[in-house]
Each structure stands twice: as C-alpha cells, then as structure tokens.
Design a protein with these regions (language model features):
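Transition-metal
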Residues: 1-71, 75-78, 135
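Short beta-strand segments
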Residues: 52, 84, 131
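Short amphipathic beta-strand/extended segments with alternating polar/hydrophobic composition
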Residues: 62-64, 99-103, 142-144
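Short, conserved beta-strand element in jelly-roll/cupin
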Residues: 74-90
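Short hydrophobic/aromatic-rich beta-strand segments that constitute the beta-sheet cores
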Residues: 91-93, 117
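Short acidic-glycine-tyrosine-enriched beta hairpin
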Residues: 93-110
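Short, charged beta-turn/beta-strand-edge "cap" motif at the junction between a beta-strand
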Residues: 112-115
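Surface-exposed beta-loop interaction hotspot
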Residues: 117-151
C-alpha cells in the first residue's frame, strides 16, 4: 500500500489577492481525502503541517512515511491526531489497538513506528481525518471518546 500525497507551498499575500476562484481553489482547497482503501495526504510547506484522510474499507491501511519527511517512519519526528468522521473503526499503534467510534479521536505521540487504520464494517467504512505536525517531544497516545468531550 502506498500513501498518496501532494505538496503545497506558501503563497505571498500580494499574490493571492490577484487569484481568481479557480486559482484559490487550486491553492487552498483540500479535497479527495476519503477514497476507499487509500491514505491521502497534503504536505504543506507552511510549518510542515500535514492534513489527510484514511478510509480503510476492504483492507487495513498502514501509515507509511513519505519522501518529503526524510524519515524511516512517518512519526519519527511528528505527532498525529486522527478523528473518525465515518463508521466504526480501529487504529493500531505499535501493536496496541484503539476502538474509535464516530466523532472519537486518537492522539499518537512522536516516535510511533507503525500506525494501521481499519474499519469494523467495510460497507460503512471508518473515515479518519488526519492532522500531523512536527514534534520535539513524545507524549503518550491518548484516545478521546465522546464521554471525554466537553458538553
């Protein structure tokens, strides 16, 4: 399984004032994140932030590193937040499995070697919205369930 990614670059404020709708969409809209059985990422040159989606339907999806990171593992120097916006799913981090229901999230600390996304039901796949940023310290993984949310 390959992780698909594109790169985005910073835009000078004087430049984007001249953009038409098509150019604004091309430079700022992030679409196509939730394609069945794919991990799709957008790596931005703005603080090296990554936004993405993982939609495991028929097969588990491993979060492999991408060339832009120049790292052996995706989370060697990064942390990850994954929010499930689809059907029930699971995320396995270095052998520990977390059940992640709709609207629940998992924080994965820097240094994790293997992250795998799965769906409970292929007919109603999990859709994990991903955010990743550089990290200079590793914190423990933490599931944030609906009961943990401030209401």
């Amino acid at each position: 399984m390959t992780v698909n990614y594109t790169e985005r670059y910073a835009v000078h404020p004087d430049d984007y004032e001249m953009y038409n709708s098509a150019m604004l969409r091309e430079n700022f809209h992030v679409g196509g994140l939730f394609v069945a059985d794919e991990v799709n990422l957008v790596y931005t040159q703005i603080d090296r932030f990554i936004v993405g989606g993982a939609c495991p339907a028929d097969t588990p999806l491993k979060l492999d590193t991408i060339d832009a990171l120049k790292a052996v593992h995706f989370l060697d120097r990064r942390e990850l937040g994954a929010v499930n916006v689809g059907g029930a799913g699971r995320i396995t981090v270095d052998g520990e499995t977390y059940d992640i229901a709709y609207k629940e999230a998992l924080y994965v600390g820097a240094g994790a070697k293997e992250v795998v996304f799965e769906s409970v039901d292929a007919a109603n796949p999990a859709k994990f919205y991903l955010n990743s940023a550089t990290a200079h310290h590793s914190y423990p993984n933490k599931k944030v369930g609906l009961d943990d949310a401030i209401k």
